[in-house]
């Protein structure tokens, strides 16, 4: 058994398969999930698991060179915006409709049980060197 980190086998494997410039979406329970990407659905009940803990776990595993969230998060969900801004200095904000369009090009979608508005982010993988 792993000592720590992500112990969900499907999620750990999906993250390990990501390469430089691949994108993944970490989303709330309400974001429409496109049909193309691999999906790891972690949602159990509304609010469980939350967006923050899932994002934090993923950020411990990945190098991120760009992050994109919906501009609407600033006003509708200031706690989520604060988390994103503090953990992702490369964060760019775009209209929510654009975020949904970009999500269709992701290689992986990780759905959480989060039930607050605009708790979504697209991460583009970087390299550790």
Swiss-Prot record:
GO biological process, one term: D-ribose catabolic process
Coiled coil: none
Catalytic residue positions: 20 (proton donor)
Pfam families documented for this protein: RbsD_FucU
Binding site for substrate: 28, 96, 118-120
InterPro entries: D-ribose_pyranase, RbsD-like_sf, RbsD_FucU
Keyword match Cytoplasm: yes
Principal location: cytoplasm
GO cellular component: cytosol
Keywords: Carbohydrate metabolism, Cytoplasm, Isomerase
Protein name (database record): D-ribose pyranase 1
Organism name: Rubrobacter xylanophilus (strain DSM 9941 / JCM 11954 / NBRC 16129 / PRD-1)
């Amino acid at each position: 058994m792993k000592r720590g980190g992500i112990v969900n086998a499907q999620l750990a494997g999906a993250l390990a398969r990501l390469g430089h410039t691949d994108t993944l979406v970490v989303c709330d329970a309400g974001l429409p999930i496109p049909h193309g990407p691999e999906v790891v659905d972690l949602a159990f009940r509304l609010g469980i698991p939350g967006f923050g803990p899932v994002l934090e776990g993923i950020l411990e595993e990945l190098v991120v060179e760009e992050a994109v969230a919906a501009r609407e998060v600033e006003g509708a969900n200031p706690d989520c915006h604060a988390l994103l801004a503090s953990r992702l200095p490369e964060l760019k904000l775009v209209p929510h409709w654009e975020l949904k369009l970009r999500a269709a090009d992701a290689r992986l979608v990780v759905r959480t049980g989060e039930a607050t508005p605009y708790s979504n982010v697209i991460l583009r993988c970087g390299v550790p060197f």
